[in-house]
A protein has these predicted regions:
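Bacterial N-terminal signal peptides that target proteins for export
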Residues: 1-9
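Bacterial N-terminal signal peptides
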Residues: 9-18
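Sec/Tat signal peptide C-region and signal peptidase I cleavage site
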Residues: 19-23
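Structured C-terminal helix/loop/strand segments within mature extracytoplasmic catalytic/sensor domains
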Residues: 24-57, 65-67, 209, 213, ...
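Active-site-adjacent helix/loop patches that line small-molecule binding or acyl-intermediate pockets
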Residues: 37-52, 56-60, 68, 123-204, ...
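A short, well-structured edge-of-sheet supersecondary motif
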Residues: 52-90, 292-293
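Active-site SXXK
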Residues: 95-118, 131, 302
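Short, well-structured active-site flanking segments
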Residues: 111-129, 140, 231-235
């Protein structure tokens, strides 16, 4: 016979297990969860692609008088769906994201929409469009609130702040579950500065700012472009928002269509080429993440991040142009 204390112990353990299961189920309702069928892409370094990228970066860094650590770049050729050829320069170096992080928030939101954990509304649709098409910081703040069930406000006592920060890290946990490493995607973007709990979350001196690598950024864009991150309908919706008409006569120096990688297509006279991208710029950073399809069959992701050369608009498109030219010549 079981002793009363033994029976009580069994009941307590059973209750704890049930509670844990219920809690996990509850978390799954709000967490951004990796699909059971998800398989991370297979990437293999290509010596030819590496030589092309190394020369392009070296030429631009020399001409632009870059210091070590001021540029990173990654290229992925996605023509073979079974195995992507890749090359990188400082591809695992963490750099401040600028607005490129908005692509990560878009992808996370589409995951939640596909899973039925978030419902699309006209306001959410407006925010998503403005975040990607116009790179609106205010729209990004709203999207991150929706994704993490957090909101800006005053600083909080430590225990309350830790609970808030755990929720704010929801997007980080999602990408970590997919095998993304060395990134931090948990902060809002601002035109000026963060205040209150947003500054508290940044640890006041920016130690917890958004950070990305060109490797992680290129991987995500490649997964979106090949329609493997979410279903085809949602993938096409993301690509629709990132589509850039590089043949337009936009005079904005920060135009995501005719500057950044778009300028490379203009300079190379790449008639018929298609461009999808998300750029980012601040007073110190100038980045672009671009996917290009050309009439001769190229399907390539090119991501270039630069720091301390934000007012020198020529460097990002120069790297892209050199890579695209070399790829054409090596066919």
């Amino acid at each position: 016979m079981f002793k009363p204390t033994r029976i009580l112990s069994i009941l307590v353990v059973s209750c704890l297990l049930v509670s844990a299961a219920v809690a996990q189920k509850g978390r799954d309702k709000i967490e951004i969860v990796k699909p059971k069928v998800y398989v991370a892409p297979l990437l293999e370094t290509s010596p030819n692609l590496q030589a092309i990228l190394d020369k392009a970066v070296s030429d631009v860094m020399t001409a632009g008088k870059f210091k070590p650590g001021e540029m990173a770049a990654t290229v992925i050729d996605v023509r073979d769906p079974a195995k992507w050829a890749t090359a990188s320069f400082e591809g695992e170096r963490q750099l401040y994201t600028a607005s490129v992080v908005k692509m990560f928030y878009m992808a996370a939101l589409e995951r939640q929409l596909e899973d039925g954990k978030v419902t699309m509304t006209k306001e959410l649709e407006r925010g998503l469009k403005d975040m990607i098409v116009d790179s609106s910081n205010e729209a990004t703040q709203y999207i991150l609130d929706v994704l993490t069930d957090t909101s800006s406000g005053s600083e909080l006592p430590q225990k309350q702040f830790e609970a808030w920060q755990y929720k704010r890290n929801r997007v980080n946990r999602f990408f970590s579950s997919l095998g993304y490493t060395n990134i931090n995607v948990n902060q809002k973007t601002f035109c000026e500065d963060a205040y209150g709990i947003e500054q508290q979350s940044r640890k006041y001196k920016g130690q917890n700012r958004n950070m990305l690598t060109t490797n992680a950024t290129a991987r995500l864009l490649a997964e979106i472009a090949t329609r493997r991150f979410v279903n085809e309908i949602r993938s096409n919706a993301m690509l629709g928002l990132m589509s850039r008409d590089w043949t337009t006569t936009d005079k904005d120096p920060n135009s995501q269509s005719v500057n950044f990688t778009g300028k490379a297509l203009i300079d190379n006279k790449m008639t018929g080429a298609k461009l999808w991208s998300k750029a980012g710029w601040t007073s110190k950073a100038r980045h672009d993440a671009a996917y290009i399809e050309t009439t001769d069959g190229q399907k390539v992701v090119i991501v270039v991040f630069t720091e301390n050369h934000a007012n020198e608009f020529e460097h990002v498109p120069a790297v892209a142009a050199k890579v695209l030219n070399a790829l054409k010549e090596s066919k």
